[in-house]
């Protein structure tokens, strides 16, 4: 009997220890599960925050990045050496790296010009584009030196046909012809008039315009054109890499010419020892801002940037 009591007492003691061990194990498992859940939540929260931050950064980059980039020199024309009149500013832009295309229609894109020192600020001066003009409509636009001038060139490469204007003056002639036909049909005055023969006397309707000349070598003969501008405006045209004939969209790899023509008001200012700012705001991305400090015009056409 004594042995049986001892055995029972021993078994009872061991049973209690077993239960105590089981309780401890359950509590430990509970802690492990809780810790795992908290770790899972923390990791997922961390991933969520990381993804959210990444999304915010990407969105910020998308907003901050410009869809267009300056792709050439900035030129400025004046009546050198008198330096009493300004005529135009010209430069080229291209879609930025990683941008597939940019729409450059005057209805979706704005161009502004500012010269704070002179108290000059013009907004939304972008009025016309030659990107939408069919090259076939310009075949008989300008007659000079016994022939029709080929204003626009076409080049085919890898099955694509690219159109471009050889220089800004050819684009000016094309713009003049296009606007003349448009305004002739609508009975409203064109903002630009170009004449290839010297006028014996300037008509009354041109006397207040800002005027300048340019000369082209056409089949060995120099032909001088008189340009009259009655309002400040900007226009664009294809310079290279534009296969989208008839569309205002500038695809990746293309080069687009931008020309700001000064009317009589802005033409009376000559910019020197000051900064001029041009801003292009397309329908995507942030504006392209071009700020150039002009020391002093060094010729009829000066490189200012």
UniProtKB/Swiss-Prot annotation:
Glycosylated. The keyword Nucleotide-binding does not apply. Residues 1-18 form a propeptide. GO terms for cellular component: archaeal-type flagellum. GO terms for biological process: archaeal or bacterial-type flagellum-dependent cell motility. One of its GO terms (molecular function) is structural molecule activity. Keywords: Archaeal flagellum, Glycoprotein. It is found in: Archaeal flagellum. Flagellin is the subunit protein which polymerizes to form the filaments of archaeal flagella. Belongs to the archaeal flagellin family. Flagellar filament preparations contain two major bands with molecular weights of 31 and 33 kDa and several minor higher molecular weight bands; both major bands have an identical N-terminal sequence. This is Flagellin FlaB2. It comes from Saccharolobus shibatae (strain ATCC 51178 / DSM 5389 / JCM 8931 / NBRC 15437 / B12) (Sulfolobus shibatae).
